Amino acid sequence: GKTASQATSLIVNRRTKFPSSSYAVMDGNYKYQYDRYNSVYRYVPFNGDIAGVCAASDNINPFVSPAGFTRGNIRNVYGMALETSRANRDDLYTNGINPIITPTGGGKVLLGDKTLLSRPSAFDRINVRRLFIILEKAIANAVQFSMFEFNDAVTRGNFVAQVEPFLRDVRASRGITDFRIICDTTNNPPSVIDRNEFRGDIFIKPNRSINFISLNFVAVASGVEFNEVVNAV
């Protein structure tokens, strides 16, 4: 058998064989699970479980992260092929591989929400990519009613009136922090209109999930006011 560090290196090397994509995710482990159809225990990839926690997240909102102790719990697992140290998990996560851990108290938890996008981008997180999939589908359904209408102020106003309430709802649900819709003569000049085209530009500020938590504890003397030391920390 291989050590955890050796196995981690092999997994990272395997990751390099895949192209960069925000539409793909990768974890680095196998689970030990009972196969009730054949009455044996066997190692099975976590792929189905990762899809399952994503599907379960849909019950809350598609744009929340499927990872963590709230939504990333994986059930009915009796063991894993690889138990990683923190250093191993850091190596995996740096390379876009989402670790699965055994926390104190038992159970298994997905502790990462990266996509396989190699370059720094908002789309290197699962929740952001899933958010934009939802937005693109919903807005595409709305814009189809503009087909074969006139590209004038009325049609452009109707488009904005359809999309804006939807994005406000997403913002209220914490999926995005802000947005802006541009659909006027600035992006629909005569040249666009003469080509029988219609343009709507939608700028989105997606919400980001917390991946790291830093806690700083400071002992304060009894006679000292808090506001005296807060800014000094």
Locations of the language-model features?
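Structured, hydrophobic secondary-structure cores that serve as assembly/anchoring elements
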Residues: 1-233
